[in-house]
Amino acid sequence: MRAVVALLATVALSSTTPSAFQAAGARGAAPASPQSRVETQRETALTPEQLKTAIDNLGKVDYAVRTAAARSIRRAPAAAVVPSLIDAIANHSDGYVRFRALVILSGLNDARTHDVMVQAMSAKNDRLRTVGYAYFEHNQDPLLLPRMLGALETESSETVRPALTRTLAAHGTDVRVREALTGLVIKGQDYFRSAVIEAIGDYKGAYALPSLLQVAKLDGPLQDDAVLAIGKIGDKKSVEILASLQRTAPRALQPTIAAAICLLGINCSSHQGYLEQSLKFSMDTDGFRDLLRASTAGLGALGTAGNTDAITQLLDYGGPSRDPARAAIALALGAVALRNTPLFLKVLQARPDPKPGIALLGEAFDMLEEDLEEERFYVTVRRGYWAAAENSPARKLAETLIQTLEF
């Protein structure tokens, strides 16, 4: 995920307390009510008073209250809900309500959303700007590129700038974007460079490969980001650099190199086997948390790229695990679920018991706090629920996800 995940992973892996998912008051801490266990109908109307109360409740401290509010808004007729959400985004006194209203609006497939997101890009509220920029990663509008490129000169928020650069990377066919992002690979703060490097890799930005190879050769905090991005881009000629690094790099970097070479399509079974071995070793042996993070992230990258065996390995090891390994595995699975939702759901549905995997996903969502991406995940799951036949495995899985993750 974005660079913030590294910070979240460090915090999670250094803690011996129960995960956020398991703690009291977190997602899934209380059983769902009987009414929430089945999606009985596509829409449930709200009165104007009920809708106003629900929107106000999006900002409540009580998790159950704000979750119930979001559920009711999502399931109300869009024609009635959208105008109220737009008004709340513009005028509500609570900044967090404005943010959550914008996230929910993103999943309602309304034509007015585009203009609201454009306005959010210039909001004073960092959360709103983050959602505004991130929305256009998946809903591209080339006409906005000059504005977003201009924002690179002024945007300095640690939450907003990664979303901005990721959306620009999604427009990687544009010469102006290529020039701007290539320059950001080798200059600027490491935190922001990490986000740029990851985004370029995810969108297979071969235009930046020479700069990425330069970073990969240097010891430092960005070396693993660059190595993995090189693998994602998929140019087999890069294997010479990766093989050279493999001979000299420290142990903690070896899983990342193995994942990158596998992503190039070279000797993948051997390198994936090494990733599994390093994961098992770091789970069983104290003092190897860097190796643990690298192993899970490597398997996660393979899973996102379409490797079902890598997802299965994470689920197999993650189900019975405990922290610190559990947090690292959950984060890797969360990244796969958000970046390659259809494949993740396919693998999860094939499991004899998907519930341990769903529990891991809930823990990941609590750590990641990727609200917009999680909303996209929910929309995909609920769409799949209604598309699947009644009592089919696909519908049962979707129902369990909706219930457990409290969408």
Regions inferred by a protein language model and the residue ranges of each:
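Sec-dependent N-terminal signal peptides
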Residues: 1-20
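Compositionally biased, proline/threonine/alanine/serine-rich low-complexity intrinsically disordered stretches
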Residues: 20-52
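Alpha-solenoid HEAT/Armadillo-like helical repeat scaffolds in large eukaryotic proteins
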Residues: 53-57, 61, 84-92, 116-124, ...
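Intrinsic disorder/low-complexity segments in short proteins, especially the signal peptide
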Residues: 12-13, 18, 26, 304, ...
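Structural detector for internal amphipathic alpha-helices that build alpha-solenoid repeat scaffolds
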Residues: 34-46, 64-78, 87, 96-110, ...
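Compositionally biased regions
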Residues: 15-16, 20, 34-37, 245, ...
